[in-house]
């Protein structure tokens, strides 16, 4: 264990002299410390000793900037111990209770009607400013700008932008130009379709373009029409527009839906789905994708009708209906005609075998599937 001999008194003596010091420790091994310069950081205030003659030097407290004096930011206005004065407008207080300026201006000593027992020190931004400002008055602000009388210089100042902001503005303008070109192309396409349906009106084309935008967001045709009218603030041929055609979620114009058009599309969709798959015990992922694609391409069918068709054509029958003799199933599986699926038959409490297509999709990817027959 190392033992320190007179280190405390030596450190105090060297610290009082304000010089670097070095200390040697005596013990089993000699340990030398590097010369360390003492740097003293003032925090709040220097503490006084208790055994002196009470005649130490003063701390130079009091007013440093009188009423009406012009000060710069961080200039000390008042040094104190405790809060004889409180920081007011455009001033702040330090950890040693020193009040200093935060803005360039003129010193004002004042009372605040909301705090009648406190004395405040603030900074007025102009020589005519008096504190405190009215409670409901707008806050005085200094922008650090002067009026430019030269028109050319004023125009150049208005056009000036930082480099980062200028690059960002260029990118935004490019994206805006591309978007405007796409919107114009869509408007022309919709105008051509409207002309085929007997409507030759540029305002209707612009309205249809706005409706197409809202429809891509998932809104209904009625919601898209209402918001498009509010955006364009027009009512020309609105009734005729709503009565003859509507805009789909794909951004195309189609005739107005009716029970006949819905029934016709329902029958056509059912015929397409029948060609893709007949209800049986197996279904593949490719068949599921084709069914979803056909249903998504519909225009007039409601969501409930789409769900009903999906349930009808995606359902799989019980695997027990596809059970074949064990020898034939195993022989076909070995020849690569399909994959072997084991099915548990609850009635006879045994295992049956089913030959499923190679691309068959099961709800659960398991080698052993249980089927419960009631």
From Swiss-Prot:
Protein name as annotated: Large ribosomal subunit protein bL27m
Pfam family of the protein (one): Ribosomal_L27
InterPro entries to which the protein is assigned, alphabetical: Ribosomal_bL27 (IPR001684)
Role, per record: Component of the large subunit of mitochondrial ribosome.
NCBIfam families: L27
Keywords, alphabetical: Mitochondrion, Ribonucleoprotein, Ribosomal protein, Transit peptide
Top-level taxonomy: Eukaryota, Fungi, Dikarya, Ascomycota, Saccharomycotina
This protein's GO CC annotations: mitochondrial large ribosomal subunit
Similarity comment: family membership: Belongs to the bacterial ribosomal protein bL27 family.
Residue range covered by the transit peptide: 1-41
Keyword Hydrolase (UniProt): no
GO biological process assignments: translation
Record has Transmembrane helix as a keyword: no
GO molecular function: structural constituent of ribosome
Compartment(s): Mitochondrion
